């Protein structure tokens, strides 16, 4: 199972956002939506062997983790509004006190923090421009790739990854959009 974890540092944790203003009023939820699509979509199909996690850290009640399961997700279309609408529905459903709850088929919501989520995962790969070139790294297809939205991970978040022994891997020396990084990782992994 391939996993992607994206931290949305400003992505709101309330359902009271407009699907017409994902970059502004929703705290860059547009980035999260594009990352969902980059993770899961193929031409005319979904990647059933991929899970996507968005850690929403915006106001008013961070953290909230939303999980999309490629195997089980329904009602997802390849546009920004569709995954954002599913996130909105999950937030409307409410955040469970413990564990995770299925909000819509294949979309789950929980109160897990970045540290909680990362500490429960293995084979961590931190995508960072200063890492080892991805083409020289052995990939099994069972990695968890961690990246951030338009902001860098905080030193505290990086410390969590370091404590778990995450490999720092680079897609190149340039900075790319998060969703583009996910497409490149999927392409690179598919070729092996």
Swiss-Prot record:
Catalyzed reactions: pseudouridine(54) in tRNA + S-adenosyl-L-methionine = N(1)-methylpseudouridine(54) in tRNA + S-adenosyl-L-homocysteine + H(+)
GO cellular component term, pick one: cytoplasm
One Pfam family named in its UniProt record: Methyltrn_RNA_2
Broad class of the protein's primary localization: cytoplasm
Keywords: Cytoplasm, Methyltransferase, S-adenosyl-L-methionine, Transferase, tRNA processing
EC category: transferase
Gene Ontology MF terms in the entry: S-adenosylmethionine-dependent methyltransferase activity; tRNA methyltransferase activity
Binding annotation for S-adenosyl-L-methionine: 127, 181
InterPro entries attached to this UniProt entry: Alpha/beta_knot_MTases (IPR029028), TrmY (IPR007158), tRNA_m1G_MTases_N (IPR029026)
EC number per UniProt: 2.1.1.257
This protein's record includes keyword DNA-binding: no
Domain of life: Archaea
Compartment annotation: Cytoplasm
GO biological process: tRNA methylation
Reported function: Specifically catalyzes the N1-methylation of pseudouridine at position 54 (Psi54) in tRNAs.
Similarity field: Belongs to the methyltransferase superfamily. TrmY family.
Subunit structure: Homodimer.
Protein name: tRNA (pseudouridine(54)-N(1))-methyltransferase
Organism the protein comes from: Methanocella arvoryzae (strain DSM 22066 / NBRC 105507 / MRE50)
């Amino acid at each position: 199972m391939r996993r992607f974890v994206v931290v949305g540092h400003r992505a709101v944790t309330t359902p009271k956002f407009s699907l017409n203003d994902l970059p502004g009023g929703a705290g860059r939820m547009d980035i999260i939506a594009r990352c969902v699509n980059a993770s899961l979509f193929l031409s005319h199909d979904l990647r059933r062997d991929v899970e996507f996690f968005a850690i929403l850290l915006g106001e008013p009640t961070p953290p909230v983790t939303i999980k999309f399961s490629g195997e089980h997700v329904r009602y997802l279309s390849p546009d920004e509004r569709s995954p954002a609408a599913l996130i909105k529905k999950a937030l409307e459903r409410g955040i469970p006190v413990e564990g995770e709850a299925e909000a819509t088929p294949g979309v789950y919501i929980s109160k897990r923090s970045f540290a909680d989520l990362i500490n429960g995962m293995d084979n961590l790969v931190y995508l960072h421009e200063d890492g080892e070139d991805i083409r020289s790294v052995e990939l099994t297809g069972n990695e968890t790739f961690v990246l951030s939205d338009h902001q860098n991970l905080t030193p505290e978040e990086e410390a969590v990854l370091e404590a778990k022994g995450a490999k720092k891997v680079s897609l190149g020396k340039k900075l790319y959009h998060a969703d583009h990084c996910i497409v490149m990782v999927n392409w690179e992994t598919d070729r092996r």
